[in-house]
């Protein structure tokens, strides 16, 4: 029992300086989103916001957490699926992610890092028909929430003491054989 108390006290002592070195940030981002399902892929524009905290640790390293809310214009439609003139579409909608970042301070103004964590995407599907079916409906839409994991890497440059720009590559793999490759540029502020 004493060993557990000693370990907890030691962890608390080391956590206090880490919290004191915490750096909060928020960013807006945009870039290329390539959504894939099965063998098909469709590119679109990815946009969103992220916020997080980085904690400096000894040796020029840092560890952090980041939450992201994004959306995409990636959409793929096929025509004449069940009848002439109909259309079936699949589109990548909102994307939520919570990741842990680990990296190194390359210089006073640059960071190189990798990250990984959980992601949840909403995928929309729709079917439009020029004729009414037996129930009187010609259109149908549905949304599916897919859980998955995200991995990636990034490079961040401080423009001023509070303003930064960064570039990231993100790979997300979800249920139902759905994945995304994203190249993102972000501009943010530290506070």
What are these regions (language model features)?
Residues 4, 10-13, 17-191:
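Gram-negative outer-membrane beta-barrel domains
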